[in-house]
């Protein structure tokens, strides 16, 4: 579980970094509200928003799955989520070539896998 908490904390820090990036870009480009139609501003906003859209649900599902699966599965899923979200952010901001595709694909596959794992685990629970 320690790996899960470290990854969750690092994802939280990534949210902070992307938030600061949007704020600084707003000041630099003099865009107070919205995206001003600026492609770089749009990418910064979407990198931040996409992390907020996916990370909390994925973290919750991984945490729930930790009741059914061991340390290594939970740790592996946590690290994959962190790497996928970092790749996506880097790709959106033009730092990591193919990062957007790899990050989005990795996140979507992880979300599907953990969801299926929980459904299967739920059906295998004993009735009390």
Name every feature range the model reports, one short phrase each.
Residues 87-113:
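Interfacial loop-to-transmembrane junctions
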Residues 20-46:
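Cytosolic, membrane-interface loops and tails of multi-pass inner-membrane proteins
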Residues 3-18:
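Alpha-helical transmembrane segments
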Residues 116-128:
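Juxtamembrane boundary at the C-terminal end of a transmembrane helix
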């Amino acid at each position: 579980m320690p790996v899960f908490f470290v990854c969750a904390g690092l994802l939280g820090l990534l949210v902070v970094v992307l938030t600061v990036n949007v704020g600084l870009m707003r000041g630099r480009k003099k865009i107070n509200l919205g995206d001003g139609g600026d492609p770089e501003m749009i990418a910064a906003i979407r990198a931040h928003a996409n992390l907020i859209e996916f990370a909390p649900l994925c973290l919750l599902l991984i945490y729930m799955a930790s009741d059914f699966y061991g340390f290594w599965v939970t740790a592996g899923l946590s690290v994959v989520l962190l790497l996928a979200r970092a790749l996506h952010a880097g790709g959106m901001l033009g730092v990591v070539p193919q990062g957007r595709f790899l990050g989005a694909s990795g996140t979507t596959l992880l979300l599907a896998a953990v969801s299926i794992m929980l459904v299967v685990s739920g059906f295998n629970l004993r009735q009390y």
